[in-house]
């Protein structure tokens, strides 16, 4: 995070050594850190082509130790899929009876666009059908929240716009909001999400919603997916306004994370 090690070197270190970690809580944390390093702190051109983390996670997901397998599978579902991980999740959907893992697999495949051999509106329709079927299998409160995330993860412009607008409207309860935000910003959504628009709606969101909902919404919609100097400049301009204290703190925190990502990408490029 502080730029003393290139992100790609950290990813390589975790990919080589994760299999040796025996403490599950530690393993879960370092896998999450490696995924963050690859998606946020590494040079995007390198990250797009590198598969060492995905390969290591896939190997761990195939472990005979059920607890370790779950940790690796959950991490694998949160990064960009490649051919082998795509096939793994397709098989998992066909064979697993674990509802939580099935939702992870389904969401990853939906976001990847590989749930069915269709694209565009047909892909969205296939996702809705698959989610409805899965919800019949897991008709629980947890299953319902997972279904909201999965549907929000459909990576089409129309879907992302609809989910964004629904979130900005401020009529969702906290749990539904969190699930839809997680799906909205799931892997593969970066180029489909607005950036500058956040700074036009943030003050309205803050003034119109309860403190808890407003904080969740502002934090979730801040355009951290657009790691660029332009977005950083927009954030600085926004922070120069006369803002409510809570809104200023929330945006400042996200602005600083964005600045860190910019610095670390520069370090990673060498």
Residues of each region from the PLM?
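Long, ordered, helix-rich scaffold segments
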Residues: 1-270
């Amino acid at each position: 995070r502080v730029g003393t090690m290139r992100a790609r070197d950290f990813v390589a270190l975790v990919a080589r050594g994760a299999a040796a970690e025996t403490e599950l809580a530690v393993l879960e944390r370092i896998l999450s850190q490696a995924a963050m390093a690859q998606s946020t702190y590494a040079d995007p051109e390198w990250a797009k082509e590198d598969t060492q983390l995905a390969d290591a996670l896939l190997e761990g997901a195939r472990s005979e130790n059920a607890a370790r397998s779950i940790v690796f599978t959950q991490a694998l579902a949160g990064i960009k899929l490649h051919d082998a991980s795509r096939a793994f999740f397709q098989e998992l959907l066909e064979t697993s009876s674990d509802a939580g893992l099935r939702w992870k697999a389904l969401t990853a495949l939906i976001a990847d666009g590989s749930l069915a051999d269709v694209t565009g509106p047909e892909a969205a329709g296939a996702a809705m059908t698959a989610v409805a079927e899965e919800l019949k299998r897991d008709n629980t409160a947890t299953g319902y929240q997972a279904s909201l995330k999965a549907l929000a993860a459909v990576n089409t412009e129309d879907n992302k716009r609809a989910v964004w607008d629904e979130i900005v409207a401020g009529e969702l309860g906290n749990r539904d909001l969190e699930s839809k935000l997680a799906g909205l910003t799931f892997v593969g959504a970066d180029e489909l999400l607005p950036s500058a628009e956040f700074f036009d709606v943030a003050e309205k969101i803050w003034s119109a919603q309860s403190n808890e909902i407003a904080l969740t919404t502002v934090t979730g919609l801040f355009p951290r997916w657009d790691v660029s100097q332009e977005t950083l400049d927009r954030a600085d301009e926004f922070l120069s306004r006369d803002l409510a204290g809570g809104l200023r703190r929330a945006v400042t925190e996200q602005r600083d994370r964005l600045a860190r990502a910019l610095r670390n990408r520069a370090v990673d490029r060498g």
